[in-house]
Design a protein with these regions (language model features):
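Conserved aromatic/hydrophobic "specificity hotspots" at molecular recognition or selectivity sites
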Residues: 178-218, 266, 276, 473-476
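Alpha-helical transmembrane segments
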Residues: 98, 219-224
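Alpha-helical transmembrane segments and their membrane-interface exit regions
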Residues: 190-194, 251-257
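12-transmembrane solute porter fold
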Residues: 24-48, 59, 65-69, 134, ...
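Intrinsic disorder in cytosolic terminal tails and internal cytosolic loops
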Residues: 1-22, 206-209, 461-476
Length: 476
């Protein structure tokens, strides 16, 4: 999965400090930490059938095992970026890493649904504190051409994380067992925790920015949790069920209240007015759809290959490798197209490819060969969409707003994964809980329709032509 950066810190006026001689070691260490966070999005998918069998968990609970992490990672990411400014980036990284390690240990020791989902929530909280602070550190540690190179390495961790995640998940589940997909974070996290103060400077906190929009963070997280609850419930009770409709309606109300709160507070978590700008709105839309589709496909594929075909977790992980590589290939090709054509056409082409890949599986037959082929085609398209979304949103942004725009886009990135898994879990419910394939066909057909509709929306919504770079002050 292509994974873009959560936020960028504001630029500071004044003469830059001399290069830190430890900067490349710091990048390597922070890269390991960020890779660990990205791994935990995809590493779980391959292990879900084993987790369900061992702990006696049903479809709905297994869906929450995936979504709880991305929900809190995305819902609290902007708050994490704000706290990094208030408390200092290194302090927040250490706190976030400590929480993540403890939550990983709890997840690995889980003996039931409550402890496992609670551990995943804790992992999401730790990731939301660690990731934006780590990126802020990378951005302030490097300057000029070195900064561009460092941020390129950071962005590349996304695709690598997806590929390593599915392989590692399969290998650990087939070897020492599914609990080790969580336990592996403990020694790695502790090593980073001990080493980090030795290679990363203690950045200054900003005492003049003590206000933190905690209500905003809680509102957007609660709204998305309510939406996911409604979507997951639909798989058992139906889309017209009272509980389903009530949960979705409550989510809509909470999102509206969030918008009101963000306009009223002095230091908002998200400047809602950014979403009135066509580039930022376009980027947020693309990241929401692309991440939802990709993580949903990992979820569907894992259950199909293991439960319906009887494949081992290791073989499933290996079969997902072309899908993960396809995402990276699509991102590489997409970056060249975006440079030449702008974001609109590559996004539309990418979404059309995603629709074609999922439609291939839905229309012909759900077989292992077609499954992997279709998902690989879809992943190439979605890789291009990730690049289009990020570049469209950030290229025209003024320097002082690039961090805000990046934070908005990447919040939609993480929340898209949570919503996508919830949707396909309900659509494919008959196949996830029984021997029939009709649920998989329904889910893949729906994803193909989503791809087509999203491609049409992209053509209408994204600015035409090559993307303009910011070249002067913006007047409001």
């Amino acid at each position: 999965m292509a994974h873009s950066s959560p936020a960028s810190p504001p630029s500071h006026v004044g003469r830059p400090e001399p290069p830190d001689p430890r900067r490349w070691r710091a990048l390597a260490l922070l890269g390991v930490a960020q890779l660990m966070l990205i791994l935990d999005v995809t590493v779980v998918n391959v292990a879900l059938p084993d987790i369900g069998a061992d702990l006696g968990l049903g479809r709905a609970t297994l869906t929450w095992v995936v979504t709880a992490y991305t929900l809190f990672f995305g819902g609290l990411m902007l708050l994490g970026g704000r706290l990094a400014d208030v408390l200092g980036a290194r302090r927040l990284m250490l706190a976030g890493l400590g929480i993540f390690v403890l939550a990983s240990l709890a997840s690995g020791l889980a003996n039931g649904a409550a402890m496992l989902v609670g551990g995943r929530v804790g992992q999401g909280l730790g990731a939301a504190l660690l990731s934006p602070a780590a990126l802020a550190t990378v951005t302030t540690t490097f300057h000029g051409a070195e900064r561009t190179k460092a941020l390129g390495v950071w962005a590349a961790l996304g695709g690598a994380g997806s590929a390593i995640g599915v392989l590692l998940g399969g290998a650990l589940t087939a070897g020492p067992g599914w609990r080790w997909i969580f336990f592996i974070n403990v020694p790695v996290g502790l090593a980073v925790l001990v080493t980090l103060p030795l290679v990363v400077r203690a950045g200054a906190a900003h005492p003049g920015t003590r206000r933190v929009d905690l209500p905003g963070a809680l509102l957007v997280t609660a709204a998305t949790a309510s939406l996911i609850y409604g979507l997951v419930n639909a798989g058992d009770a139906g889309w017209g069920d009272t509980v389903t409709l009530t949960a979705v309606a409550a989510a809509a109300v909470l999102y509206a209240v969030f918008g009101v709160v963000e306009r009223a507070v002095r230091t908002p978590l998200m400047r809602v007015r950014l979403l009135t700008r066509r580039p930022v709105l376009s980027g947020a839309f693309l990241m929401l759809v692309a991440t939802g589709m990709l993580i949903g496909l990992f979820f569907l594929g894992s259950f199909y290959l293991q439960r319906h075909q009887g494949y081992s977790a290791l073989l499933t992980g290996l079969l997902f490798l072309p899908v993960a590589v396809g995402t990276g290939l699509g991102a590489h090709l997409g970056s060249h197209l975006v440079d030449r054509l702008g974001g609109r056409l590559p996004a539309a082409i990418g979404l059309t490819l995603a629709a074609a890949g999922t439609g291939l599986v839905a229309l012909l037959a759900v077989t292992p060969t077609l499954m992997v082929t279709g998902l690989t085609v879809a992943s190439i398209g979605l890789g291009a969409v990730f690049v289009s979304g990020t570049t469209t949103a950030l290229a025209p942004a003024a320097p002082e707003e690039s961090g805000l725009a990046s934070g908005v886009v990447n919040t939609f990135h993480e929340l898209g994964g949570a919503v996508g898994v919830a949707v396909v879990s309900s659509l494919a419910a008959p196949s996830l809980t029984g021997p029939v394939l009709t649920g998989f066909t329904t889910a893949f057909t729906s994803w193909a329709v989503v791809g087509v509709v999203a491609a049409l929306v992209a053509l209408a919504l994204l600015p035409p032509g090559r993307l303009p770079a910011f070249d002067g002050p913006r007047v409001h």
